[in-house]
From Swiss-Prot:
Catalytic activity: (S)-ureidoglycolate = urea + glyoxylate
Species of the source: Brucella abortus (strain 2308)
Record-stated family: Belongs to the ureidoglycolate lyase family.
The EC number(s) this enzyme carries: 4.3.2.3
Stretches of the chain forming a coiled coil according to its record: none
UniProt-recorded name of the protein: Ureidoglycolate lyase
Amino acid sequence: MQIETLTVEPLTKEAFAPFGDVIEVEGAQLRLINNGTTERYHDLARMEAAGTQTRVLINIFRGQSFAAPIDIMMMERHPFGSQAFIPLNGRPFLVVVAEDAGAGPARPRAFLARGDQGVNYLRNIWHHPLLALEQKSDFLVVDRAGREDNLEEYFFSDYAYRIETTQTA
């Protein structure tokens, strides 16, 4: 099996834009609400929920921790809805995404999310399942429920991608 190394990039709104949204207060539109006692950081992600008998779900995912090296052997995507991950424990995590290459994902990109950043994968974006770092971590996950199957998986058969370090380049 051929293995190609991925370089970890810092998670920024600009770099992540083709794949979805970085959920963070930095640069967000601020509105004071509740008679000025609460700061609302407005419209942080573009949530999508298409299909039949659709609704938005809120879940808590508890992700097992990973340590480098991490082999990326598969990716998944959700054709009917976006999926957002917001860390609840303030710990960093890895985000691995790829554009569509027609018959599956293109070469993935890896990002290091700080513990105060979340991500929203847009509909049909290839991504690796949750990669918590340091220790088991909880994430608030905004997802889509509906009648249609909202999961497609792709397994790399002749090659894999490896993350040698969880530090950014």
